[in-house]
Amino acid sequence: MSMADQLQIPADIKPRDGRFGCGPSKVRPEQLQALSTTAAPLFGTSHRQAPVKNLVGRLRSGLAELFSLPDGYQVILGNGGATAFWDAAAFGLIDKRSLHLSYGEFSSKFAAAVAKNPFVGDPVVIKSDAGSAPEPQSDPSVDLIAWAHNETSTGVAVPVRRPVDSGDALVAIDATSGAGGLPVDIGETDAYYFSPQKNFAGDGGLWLALMSPAALARVESIAASGRWVPDFLSLPIAVENSLKDQTYNTPAIGTLALMAEQVDWMLGNGGLDWAVKRTADSAGRLYSWAEERDYTTPFVADPKLRSQVVGTIDFVDDVDAAAVAKILRANGVVDTEPYRKLGRNQLRVGMFPAVDPDDVSALTQCVDWVVERL
């Protein structure tokens, strides 16, 4: 019998819900219940008819309220997830050249997608080591500046502020794991894009972008230039359909319904301010615990860059974090493993709004209990 099978964490210290994944993330039971009640009549019906379009409209209006969208900004959506949006943006938001901050797996991927696109110039890439981040900056040769609000692979969060002297360059923020859990002034961005499976406790396969009038104008001007774009990645097509409360091709009703329920739940509890305070509470508990123990330390050295939605905790060499995660998983406390390509002796903890801060505290108790017995 393995150590993971032998160690049984006492029930009275375990979290009430043991899901701490960084995406897919915890889905609240009330969201799942809605799939079989209020959303049930929508399954198997046309996405071009009022019932499904009303669901899309509910989601779009909810996001507009949650993020206090400035005048002229629009909620645009399409199928394919934020990964698809990287290619869509390369085709439809970059006129000639872009600048990218690269400080982890996901912030580097947008730059890589742009580098492969034959219609735009080679991107300017500003790199830093994992666990840190470059300062947002401008460059006179670029017309789009991009970085990630939250680097999911490392737990680094970079504030969203339009760089000085950025001129007419658009600011595109990958908010896949930041939107809904980190503070943001949408007016500082032109395309703030994300997916449902992080803070919004939904399934993947959908991208959403909060787009400014300048971004919408850029979409139109690039389309008018005659640049070839696959229809599936066409931002003009996405904009046209979104303004009609629909997607270009058939959406997953469950994904839309789960996310709409989560947005309504956030709004009902106090909106983005409430959600940000909740994730900050969770993060405060995790990082203070890690700093108090002699066998753990936060991976992100600069407290100002530590994410309050994705926490990465390093362990000393003589404590095997992988063994800890395996024992936790055997006891129903799941998805605390680090990002696979980072290759560190650490745990990674999702602290999205659906996660109860008390469960984060319980997780730390469980880790203490396990480490004492290794």
From Swiss-Prot:
<keyword id="KW-0028">Amino-acid biosynthesis</keyword>
<keyword id="KW-0808">Transferase</keyword>
<dbReference type="GO" id="GO:0005737">
    <property type="term" value="C:cytoplasm"/>
</dbReference>
<dbReference type="InterPro" id="IPR015421">
    <property type="entry name" value="PyrdxlP-dep_Trfase_major"/>
</dbReference>
<feature type="binding site">
    <location>
        <position position="106"/>
    </location>
    <ligand>
        <name>pyridoxal 5'-phosphate</name>
    </ligand>
</feature>
<comment type="subunit">
    <text>Homodimer.</text>
</comment>
<dbReference type="GO" id="GO:0008453">
    <property type="term" value="F:alanine-glyoxylate transaminase activity"/>
</dbReference>
<dbReference type="InterPro" id="IPR000192">
    <property type="entry name" value="Aminotrans_V_dom"/>
</dbReference>
<dbReference type="InterPro" id="IPR015422">
    <property type="entry name" value="PyrdxlP-dep_Trfase_small"/>
</dbReference>
<keyword id="KW-0663">Pyridoxal phosphate</keyword>
<feature type="binding site">
    <location>
        <position position="48"/>
    </location>
    <ligand>
        <name>L-glutamate</name>
    </ligand>
</feature>
<keyword id="KW-0963">Cytoplasm</keyword>
<dbReference type="InterPro" id="IPR006272">
    <property type="entry name" value="Pser_aminoTfrase_mycobac"/>
</dbReference>
<comment type="pathway">
    <text>Amino-acid biosynthesis; L-serine biosynthesis; L-serine from 3-phospho-D-glycerate: step 2/3.</text>
</comment>
<comment type="similarity">
    <text>Belongs to the class-V pyridoxal-phosphate-dependent aminotransferase family. SerC subfamily.</text>
</comment>
<dbReference type="GO" id="GO:0006564">
    <property type="term" value="P:L-serine biosynthetic process"/>
</dbReference>
<protein>
    <recommendedName>
        <fullName>Putative phosphoserine aminotransferase</fullName>
        <ecNumber>2.6.1.52</ecNumber>
    </recommendedName>
</protein>
<feature type="modified residue" description="N6-(pyridoxal phosphate)lysine">
    <location>
        <position position="198"/>
    </location>
</feature>
<feature type="binding site">
    <location>
        <position position="152"/>
    </location>
    <ligand>
        <name>pyridoxal 5'-phosphate</name>
    </ligand>
</feature>
<feature type="binding site">
    <location>
        <position position="197"/>
    </location>
    <ligand>
        <name>pyridoxal 5'-phosphate</name>
    </ligand>
</feature>
<dbReference type="GO" id="GO:0004648">
    <property type="term" value="F:O-phospho-L-serine:2-oxoglutarate aminotransferase activity"/>
</dbReference>
<dbReference type="GO" id="GO:0008615">
    <property type="term" value="P:pyridoxine biosynthetic process"/>
</dbReference>
<keyword id="KW-0664">Pyridoxine biosynthesis</keyword>
<keyword id="KW-0718">Serine biosynthesis</keyword>
<dbReference type="GO" id="GO:0030170">
    <property type="term" value="F:pyridoxal phosphate binding"/>
</dbReference>
<feature type="binding site">
    <location>
        <begin position="82"/>
        <end position="83"/>
    </location>
    <ligand>
        <name>pyridoxal 5'-phosphate</name>
    </ligand>
</feature>
<comment type="pathway">
    <text>Cofactor biosynthesis; pyridoxine 5'-phosphate biosynthesis; pyridoxine 5'-phosphate from D-erythrose 4-phosphate: step 3/5.</text>
</comment>
<dbReference type="GO" id="GO:0004760">
    <property type="term" value="F:L-serine-pyruvate transaminase activity"/>
</dbReference>
<dbReference type="Pfam" id="PF00266">
    <property type="entry name" value="Aminotran_5"/>
</dbReference>
<feature type="binding site">
    <location>
        <begin position="249"/>
        <end position="250"/>
    </location>
    <ligand>
        <name>pyridoxal 5'-phosphate</name>
    </ligand>
</feature>
<feature type="binding site">
    <location>
        <position position="174"/>
    </location>
    <ligand>
        <name>pyridoxal 5'-phosphate</name>
    </ligand>
</feature>
<dbReference type="InterPro" id="IPR015424">
    <property type="entry name" value="PyrdxlP-dep_Trfase"/>
</dbReference>
<dbReference type="InterPro" id="IPR022278">
    <property type="entry name" value="Pser_aminoTfrase"/>
</dbReference>
<comment type="function">
    <text>Catalyzes the reversible conversion of 3-phosphohydroxypyruvate to phosphoserine and of 3-hydroxy-2-oxo-4-phosphonooxybutanoate to phosphohydroxythreonine.</text>
</comment>
<keyword id="KW-0032">Aminotransferase</keyword>
<dbReference type="GO" id="GO:0019265">
    <property type="term" value="P:glycine biosynthetic process, by transamination of glyoxylate"/>
</dbReference>
